[in-house]
Amino acid sequence: MSLSVSRRLAAVTAFAVAGLFASAVPAALAAPSAVAAAPTPPDIPLANVKAHLSQLSTIAANNGGNRAHGRAGYKASIDYVKGKLDAAGFTTTLQTFTSSGATGYNLIADWPGGDPNSVLMAGSHLDSVTSGAGINDNGSGSAAVLETALAVSRAGLQPTKHLRFGWWGAEELGLIGSKYYVNNLPAAEKAKISGYLNFDMIGSPNPGYFVYDDDPTIEQTFKNYYAGLGVPTEIETEGDGRSDHAPFKNAGIPVGGLFSGADYTKTAAQAQKWGGTSGQAFDRCYHSSCDSLTNINDTALDRNSDAVAYAIWTLGAGTPVPPGQSFENTADVNVPDSPAAAVSSPITVSGVTGNAPATTKVDVNIVHTYRGDLVVDLVAPDGTVYNLHNRSGGSADNLVQTYTVNASSEVANGVWNLRVKDTAAQDVGYINSWKITF
């Protein structure tokens, strides 16, 4: 977390537009195998989060003792996180900017699928101050967001909303990286972000449990999680406007997040309800060389990491696709004899919220004198092909069949096609009708 304006030296910043910015959902995201969304948020393994912290600590130790903007330790931290996400199936974009004469980096990771017009973002700053490794500030938030993203991959989660994760550079110089990202988003892309969740310092050694009160829906989501644990929360005031949610909020994007305290002092009342030591700072090593692996409270880190996942699973679900919405094309399409090219019959789907279900129904009615000649595919709006029929059925005529397709990685709205090809000579037919039901 950066110092407030009154408590830090003014950061002299020179922006330079460099490289691509990750403003939009990539046009063609290669989705992993489609699986049904996990029914409940997962427990994020504390050991995994701490393993990421250990890696960040080692990176700092090998690069002058810190992971600050413009230093080798920061770029190595970005490379570590990016490698994990690339291996897990995310589409990553490295965004560059210039501040204080040095190149800075933001890392954006998009999870395939979800409604591209309704994006849920979660992020944290990855840089430290120059005086230390920054394990709580903000290795803790960065590691929790990373492990939650990896949990999304492990679950094959396909929520209604599109999921995007961000790791920001040069936060400690005045929110430079996140400002750069937001300022370079076109207005249309900003409008697609339904919420941004920020996690900055969530493993403080003398922790409190603070919830941002900016957006009421996001705030209540976190409060519901902690109520389920029987842990009271307070509204976060110490870092208000001092972390990477501020540029999003200033752009009119709903924001929320968690915080476990920095250099404010824990009161007796707070110690009574949360434990810990009253009269001491929530983090006595804030912006100091002692912000190391020993500067983490495991209970706070574990609870807050689980809260990150709870919010992603809950807020990402959005409004489920109403069952039973059907779209049909009854126009005849001739299927020419081999070796002619395949033919397609389109259906335009609109007004459906989110993704197609894992049990998408496709009803096919093809009149043909030899169905064993036919290859029939469902082609999704993004071009993904789902094979329905591949030359089976022998010499029987006509293909009248209902298929169940796991299309949960596909946005429902758009143009779907039934594609049919005759692969052998002497028989002909036509597509009589077909229907897709969500």
Swiss-Prot record:
Is Ribonucleoprotein found in the keyword set? no
Question: A GO term (biological process) for this protein?
Answer: proteolysis
Q: List the residues marked with site Transition state stabilizer.
A: 286
As cofactor, the record names: Zn(2+)
Q: How is its activity regulated?
A: Activity is inhibited by metalloprotease inhibitors and activated by Mg(2+) and Ca(2+).
Q: Where is the P/Homo B domain?
A: 321-438
Leader sequence segment: 1-37
Question: In what way does activity depend on pH?
Answer: Optimum pH is 9.0.
Q: Which residues are involved in binding Zn(2+) 1?
A: 125, 137, 200
CDD domains this protein is in?
A: M28_SGAP_like
Cysteines paired by S-S bonds: 285-290
Per annotation, the relation between temperature and activity is:
Optimum temperature is 40 degrees Celsius.
Q: What is this protein called?
A: Leupeptin-inactivating enzyme 1
The protein's gene is named: lieA
